[in-house]
Structures are given as structure tokens and as C-alpha cells.
């Protein structure tokens, strides 16, 4: 780990007292960064799993076979992120270099298929699963755009697109009217959530805290819209 901050002049020599103190501080900062990245990576995988579940539930209503279910689950889960990476010229595409994404998609899809054979899901299960997937992907997409040093308006756009594109592809493939084209509060929830995430950072909150705040806004808006039938117009 020393190599990560060996060039920092504040860390001094290993034998100096001040150098040792700075090394402890630097090590703590590095561990904090690694920890935050691991948490965000885990949340990204959770988002993939949730969107894969929503893809299975949508495919189930169309009576497709198991291969079709897996394809729809995968397109739903990675469609938005793939489009984001292409537009940001971010290569290789995130799921090509990390097999964990496809593993999570397949496992989530198969578990969901097995579950719905035993117990039919609640009527709003697809919408609720989609709400959590939308929140996770919108915020993770925003962070990718931030890392690419995009201006705030592009961060909002990329976050929203990452969140909604997979669901749009899912609905088109299963011959449904995409949620983004209905009167429901959908893309609006992603836009407001990502904007709130940026606003929290502007007020001095850490990125991980702002991430949580943005997620809460997206999920809350979607669940309120589902529960009370709220519309944009």
C-alpha cells in the first residue's frame, strides 16, 4: 500500500515521526476510497440483479422460453450501462471485462424463474423492482459521467439514460408501451434524483452520502407514483 502514496512529500521518510503520521493518514484515506468503491460496485451489482428480475417478470407475461427470459433479463440489466459507455467512449464495455455482471444476471433470472413457478409475484412486483433498479442505475450512471469529467447537465442526462434505457428495451421487446412514454413519473424521478445528488455534493456532502440521498429521492418518487397514481401532467 505504501506505493500508493510513496510520492507524496507529506508522507516523509519511513523513519521520521511526521512521515509515519502522514503514512497513517494516507493509508486511512486509501482504505476509505477502496471501501467506497467496493460499496458502489456492490450496489451496481444489486442494480443489475434487480433489473434482471424485472426483465424476467416482464418476459413471464409474454410466455417466452427460458433462453428468451435470460436474453430479456440481460438486455434489461445491462442495456442502459452499455449505451452510456458507448456514448462516453468508455471501452471496454463494463460487463465485458467483469464476468460478475453476467453471473449475477443469470443467477438472479434463474432464481426468479424458480420462485414465480412456486408463488406468483404480487401485482406491482415488476414496478417496484424497476423502481429500485432505476434508482441504482441512475446514480451509478451519474458517477461514471462524473468520472469522465462531464458537465452537470451531461451527468444528469447520462444518469437518467443509464436508469431508463434498459427498461425501455425490455418494454419494447415484450411489446409493452415503455414506462418512459407513459404519464407515470419515471424519467422525471431519475432526473430529480440525479440533480439532488449533485446538489448535495455542492453543499459539501461526501459522494457516498449524496449517492444515498439521490437514491432515496428516486425510489420515493417512483413508489409514491405507483401507490397513489401520481402523474407528471
Model-derived segments and their meaning:
Residues 107-144:
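Ordered, amphipathic secondary-structure segments that act as subunit-interaction surfaces
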Residues 71-75, 82-88, 157, 161, ...:
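Short, structured motif recognition centered on aromatic/hydrophobic residues
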Residues 37-40, 86-96, 140-154, 200-209:
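Helix-coil boundary and interhelical linker segments in multi-pass alpha-helical membrane proteins
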Residues 73-79, 129-143, 161, 185-198:
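Small-residue-rich segments of transmembrane alpha-helices in multi-pass membrane proteins
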Residues 38-48, 93-107, 151-163:
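Structural signature of hydrophobic alpha-helical transmembrane segments
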Residues 67-75, 98-102, 123-133, 158, ...:
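Cytoplasmic-side transmembrane-helix entry/capping segments in multi-pass membrane proteins
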Residues 53-62, 85-86, 110-123, 168-178, ...:
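C-terminal ends of transmembrane helices
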Amino acid at each position: 500500500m505504501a506505493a500508493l502514496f510513496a510520492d507524496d512529500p507529506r508522507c516523509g521518510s519511513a523513519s521520521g515521526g511526521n512521515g509515519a503520521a502522514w503514512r497513517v493518514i494516507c493509508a486511512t484515506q486509501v482504505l476509505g476510497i477502496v471501501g467506497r468503491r467496493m460499496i458502489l460496485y456492490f450496489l451496481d451489482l444489486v442494480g443489475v440483479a434487480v433489473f434482471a428480475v424485472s426483465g424476467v417478470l416482464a418476459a413471464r407475461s409474454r410466455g417466452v422460453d427460458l433462453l428468451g427470459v435470460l436474453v430479456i433479463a440481460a438486455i434489461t440489466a445491462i442495456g442502459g450501462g452499455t449505451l452510456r459507455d458507448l456514448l462516453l467512449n468508455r471501452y471496454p464495455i463494463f460487463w465485458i471485462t467483469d464476468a460478475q455482471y453476467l453471473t449475477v444476471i443469470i443467477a438472479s433470472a434463474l432464481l426468479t424463474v424458480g420462485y414465480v413457478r412456486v408463488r406468483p409475484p404480487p401485482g406491482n412486483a415488476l414496478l417496484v423492482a424497476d423502481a429500485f433498479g432505476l434508482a441504482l442505475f441512475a446514480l451509478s450512471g451519474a458517477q461514471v459521467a462524473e468520472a469522465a469529467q462531464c458537465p452537470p447537465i451531461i451527468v444528469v442526462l447520462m444518469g437518467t439514460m443509464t436508469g431508463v434505457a434498459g427498461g425501455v428495451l425490455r418494454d419494447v421487446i415484450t411489446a409493452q408501451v415503455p414506462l418512459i412514454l407513459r404519464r407515470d413519473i419515471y424519467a422525471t424521478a431519475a432526473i430529480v434524483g440525479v440533480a439532488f445528488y449533485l446538489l448535495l455534493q455542492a453543499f459539501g456532502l461526501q459522494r457516498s452520502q449524496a449517492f444515498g440521498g439521490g437514491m432515496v429521492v428516486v425510489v420515493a418518487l417512483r413508489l409514491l407514483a405507483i401507490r397513489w397514481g401520481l402523474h407528471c401532467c
